[in-house]
Amino acid sequence: MPAPVLSGPQYLREGLKLVLSPGLRLFVLLPLAINLVLFVGLIYLAGHQFSLWVDTLMPSLPEWLSFLSYILWPLFVVLVALMVFFTFTMLANVIAAPFNGFLAEKVEVVVRGTDDFPAFSWGELIAMIPRTLAREMRKLGYFLPRAIGLFILSFIPVVNIVAAPLWLLFGVWMMAIQYIDYPADNHKLGWNEMLAWLRQKRWQSMSFGGIVYLVLLIPVVNILMMPAAVAGATLFWVRERGAENLVTQR
């Protein structure tokens, strides 16, 4: 098996070790804590409103329907659990996006041994949010038309047999784009330039995107793997770009 195909798991494994180190834990724990506080607050508000609704509803029902109060609450708990399961990771990605840029910076400092980036400050983090969200919207703009095209393809007879493998390949490619974009954006590499560079490193990109795609499918584990993927993508960036520069200098 070619070495580039094996590089993805190696980068992710090294990235996981880095984010568990004392100097980088802040950028993992802080967005996770914000996400947890937000979800706890939303669940509390939803529970309070639901309780008021049940208290208002039950007196208006016939007595023989009083058993509904014992059914409504379990249904509410199941609904909340499903909502958390399907939206926690999605919201965590949005909240962590500005922190991921800083995490990529700090990983690069650790790997290179030189700090060419400004020190972390809350002011800079807040100033970074519009740019980060704009970049996330750019990713969404890249993803949606292609996803819609594949969705339509899934309903075309005969042709739809290729839809499943294409969905898988596209998902893997998007994982590479999602995480390599953080170090690329830190170095002000344009969107189209980043895509062109990833295509040049196609085997490495698909290897990295593939392993990230797999681990992010695992509930709970995926929360830790998101920052590990940022760190792994930064290692990918530093080493692959460094190798290119070395070849250019020669």
UniProtKB/Swiss-Prot annotation:
One Pfam family of this chain: EI24
Gene Ontology cellular component list: plasma membrane
TM stretches of this protein: 26-46, 71-91, 150-170, 211-231
Cell compartments where the protein resides: Cell inner membrane
Keyword Transport: yes
Gene Ontology MF terms: high-affinity sulfate:proton symporter activity
InterPro entries according to UniProt: CysZ_sulfate_transptr, Sulfate_CysZ
GO biological process: cysteine biosynthetic process; sulfate assimilation
The keyword Hydrolase is assigned to this record: no
Record's keyword terms, sorted: Amino-acid biosynthesis, Cell inner membrane, Cell membrane, Cysteine biosynthesis, Membrane, Sulfate transport, Transmembrane, Transmembrane helix, Transport
Membrane topology note: Multi-pass membrane protein
Function description: High affinity, high specificity proton-dependent sulfate transporter, which mediates sulfate uptake. Provides the sulfur source for the cysteine synthesis pathway.
Family of the protein in this entry: Belongs to the CysZ family.
PANTHER family hit by this protein: SULFATE TRANSPORTER CYSZ
Protein name according to UniProt: Sulfate transporter CysZ
Species of origin: Pseudomonas fluorescens (strain Pf0-1)
Source species taxonomy: Bacteria, Pseudomonadati, Pseudomonadota, Gammaproteobacteria, Pseudomonadales
